[in-house]
């Protein structure tokens, strides 16, 4: 099974830590990453599994499109991480762990090696009740980083923030 292969090889996977200047971004078109897991399982509302397969196999061009929603998340993520670090007395930093052999990439929002835990930050419209897509992504990261704990920090955009985004979009 894939999980067994991850367990056997994860010690050899280098962890790339964010320098603090910008978010760690390992080429998303090359690897299967955490955000791909809900798509593969058919529980993503954004992309279908067959389209993901076409993208990863370069049948259709991969576009790393930035949207206002993703940009909002990138802007807020460091602030949310800072608040979570203080609240839970931890020191998470953005990291990426990649397995060339397995073609996997775990680009996590926060990893605290001392406390052996992860932080996953999500921003949404505040109406994301079914967390199954978040949970499968988190489980993937937990397997890649060999941790048993992850804190999900979720920020629901205010009505005013949603209105601004909708006007701009």
Label each PLM-derived region with a short phrase:
Residues 1-75, 79, 87:
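Charged, glycine-rich intrinsically disordered N-terminal tails and low-complexity linkers that flank
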Residues 70, 87-169:
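Nucleic-acid nuclease catalytic cores
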Residues 77-81, 135-138:
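Short, well-ordered alpha-helical scaffold segments within catalytic/effector domains
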